[in-house]
């Protein structure tokens, strides 16, 4: 029997200004869906897997074909509904409604666990959408580079006087998200040793210039790190190995990194984490024929790695969970103090979220890198005093290789996003850009996710698990006229541990787009300021007042 999720075809997004659909509002999701499965973008495109273990763009290849065919014929007063990667309906709405509404991996809370999801997945009744995989706005490892860079820079400020020169970071995982870590570390001025069990992933990062070198030898990796740090160079190396083996070995040897974190796909104990002592081939085979054995062995191995991270923490080394739920897995395996070290958001990033600043991104549907160069320049023009952002854009231009359609990640917040969107739309209208731009973001944004072990960890008022906020975010983006809106469960940290929403809006150069952009790109980050103001953060309360937000129960206006 053939596998409906496997096909050897190669998918790439169309380029240029010629439409394959009836309008740019349907051409945009068509191109971004296809871009998610570009072999230069996706981790395992032949299996529809974009990143993050089994984060897929469509449920089956037949569903992919149906989505493509539907988008090509969708009218400007119709909306396509996608249920866990399957196109289930087309309904008449209106021209300012989203052209696509997506719900992925959502389960009633009592059944929101991997066992139940995997049972549904095996029957072909569900699809894991991760965050930007099933919502068609993944842009490769660049999508998390700036957030990781901001994290490392802030860690440097807090622990090392703002200077990471001569310092090094230990981490694990070089998948679609973790692959950003070596480059982010180097951009922040540090060296990086990244442990990866799957050599093909390390090779992918070498090919796209996200990591500088590769080795199979721990001794060689440490020697290079030592030489680079002594010389004040910022370089990175991928070590082929198992983090659950390497981290404890480093503790045993008394090796002391300057920062420790991890971005293995520990959120998925079957498909995301190689058990100690197993080969990758054995692991892949047993995922299909004995998933329970894989999960048991993987969880035990995670406990070993987290114990090593605790050992680093107890030795005074800054150590953070980078949002993959590995501490939770270790806790469930009996490691009672697994949460002794913090997550990266409460440790370093939350003040940005309080001002609605987060992973704003855009992609050039033309496929021409020059369109991104022009938008980079426009960002600098409109935000002339943000030298930190200018520095980021300069580094990104020099260091980041585009994957698939040219794109840019750029952390900006409430008060700036709508200005950039309107400027980009004007550039499309006057012909400065060769084709429309789409603007989206990661689901891990200021007001669009509830994830108690990641983004909403240790909220000031204890509201970590309240998931009304991403639901309201999705509803508001729908009402505001985003081009497509998504609502997912389980991204980043796995089943039962998160709910989150995404939006993408197309700058097609029209005046209608101006109105939609102004609404969406104001309201979307404003929900994040609202959420943090409601939790009692002074930065958010001050920013809400400065931006004139009307928050009756929070500001009394």
From Swiss-Prot:
Record's function text: Catalyzes the conversion of urocanate to 4-imidazolone-5-propionate.
Details of cofactor binding: Binds 1 NAD(+) per subunit.
UniProt xrefs under PANTHER family: UROCANATE HYDRATASE (PTHR12216:SF4)
Superkingdom per UniProt: Bacteria
Gene Ontology CC terms: cytoplasm
InterPro entries: Urocanase (IPR055351), Urocanase-like (IPR023637), Urocanase_C (IPR035401), Urocanase_central_sf (IPR038364), Urocanase_N (IPR035400), Urocanase_Rossmann-like (IPR035085), Urocanase_sf (IPR036190)
The species this protein was found in: Brucella melitensis biotype 2 (strain ATCC 23457)
Protein name from the UniProt record: Urocanate hydratase
Region ranges (Disordered): 1-20
BP GO annotations: L-histidine catabolic process to glutamate and formamide; L-histidine catabolic process to glutamate and formate
Example GO molecular function: urocanate hydratase activity
EC code(s) of this entry: 4.2.1.49
Pathway: Amino-acid degradation; L-histidine degradation into L-glutamate; N-formimidoyl-L-glutamate from L-histidine: step 2/3
Cofactor: NAD(+)
Protein family (similarity comment): Belongs to the urocanase family.
Catalytic machinery residues: 410
Subcellular location: Cytoplasm
Pfam families: Urocanase, Urocanase_C, Urocanase_N
NAD recorded as keyword: yes
Residues reported in the UniProt entry to bind NAD(+): 52-53, 130, 176-178, 196, 201, 242-243, 263-267, 273-274, 322, 492
Alphabetical UniProt keywords: Cytoplasm, Histidine metabolism, Lyase, NAD
């Amino acid at each position: 029997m053939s596998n409906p999720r496997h096909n050897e075809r190669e998918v790439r997004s169309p380029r240029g200004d010629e439409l394959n659909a009836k309008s740019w509002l349907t051409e945009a999701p068509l191109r971004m869906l296809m871009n998610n499965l570009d072999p230069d973008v996706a981790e395992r495109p032949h299996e529809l897997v974009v990143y993050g273990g089994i984060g897929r763009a469509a449920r089956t290849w037949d569903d992919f074909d149906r989505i493509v065919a539907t988008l090509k014929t969708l009218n400007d007063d119709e909306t396509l509904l996608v249920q866990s990667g399957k196109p289930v309906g087309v309904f008449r709405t209106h021209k300012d409604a989203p052209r696509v509404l997506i719900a992925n991996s959502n389960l009633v809370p009592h059944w929101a666990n991997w066992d139940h999801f995997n049972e549904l997945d095996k029957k072909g009744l569900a699809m894991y959408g991760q965050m930007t995989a099933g919502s068609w706005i993944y842009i490769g490892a660049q999508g998390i580079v700036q957030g990781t860079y901001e994290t490392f820079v802030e860690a440097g400020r807090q622990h090392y006087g703002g200077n990471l020169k001569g310092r090094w970071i230990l981490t694990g995982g070089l998948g679609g998200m973790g692959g950003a870590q070596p480059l982010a570390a180097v951009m922040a001025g540090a060296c990086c040793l990244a442990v990866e069990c799957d050599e093909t992933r390390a090779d992918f990062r070498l090919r796209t210039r996200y990591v500088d070198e590769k080795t199979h030898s721990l001794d060689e990796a440490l020697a290079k790190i030592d030489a680079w740090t002594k010389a004040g160079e910022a370089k990175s190396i991928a070590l082929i190995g198992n983090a659950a083996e390497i981290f404890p070995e480093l503790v045993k040897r008394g090796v002391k990194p300057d920062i420790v974190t991890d971005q293995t796909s520990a959120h998925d104990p079957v498909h995301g984490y190689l058990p100690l002592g197993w080969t990758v081939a054995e692991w892949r085979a047993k995922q299909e024929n004995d998933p329970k054995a894989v999960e048991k062995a993987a969880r035990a191995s995670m406990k070993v790695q987290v114990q090593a991270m605790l050992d680093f923490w107890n030795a005074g080394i800054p150590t953070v969970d980078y949002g993959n739920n590995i501490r939770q897995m270790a806790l469930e395996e009996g490691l009672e103090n697994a949460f002794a070290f913090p997550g990266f958001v409460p440790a370093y990033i939350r003040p940005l979220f309080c001002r609605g600043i987060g992973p704003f991104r855009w992609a050039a549907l033309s496929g021409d890198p020059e369109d991104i160069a022009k938008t980079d320049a426009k960002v600098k023009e409109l935000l002339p005093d943000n030298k930190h952002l200018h520095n980021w854009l300069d580094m990104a231009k020099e260091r980041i290789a585009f994957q698939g359609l040219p794109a840019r990640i750029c952390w900006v917040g409430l008060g700036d996003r709508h200005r950039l969107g309107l400027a980009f739309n004007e550039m499309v209208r006057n012909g400065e850009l060769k084709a429309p731009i789409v603007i989206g973001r990661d689901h891990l944004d200021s007001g669009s996710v509830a994830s108690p072990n990641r983004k909403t960890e240790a909220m000031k008022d204890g509201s970590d698990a309240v998931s009304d906020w991403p639901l309201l975010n999705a509803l508001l983006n729908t009402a505001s006229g985003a081009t497509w809106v998504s609502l997912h469960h389980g991204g980043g940290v796995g089943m039962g541990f998160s709910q989150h929403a995404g939006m993408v809006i197309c700058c097609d150069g029209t005046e209608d787009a101006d109105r939609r952009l102004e609404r969406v790109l104001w309201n979307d980050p404003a929900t994040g300021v609202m959420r943090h103001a409601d939790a009692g953060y002074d930065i958010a309360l001050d920013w809400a007042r400065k931006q004139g937000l009307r928050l009756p129960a929070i500001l009394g206006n």
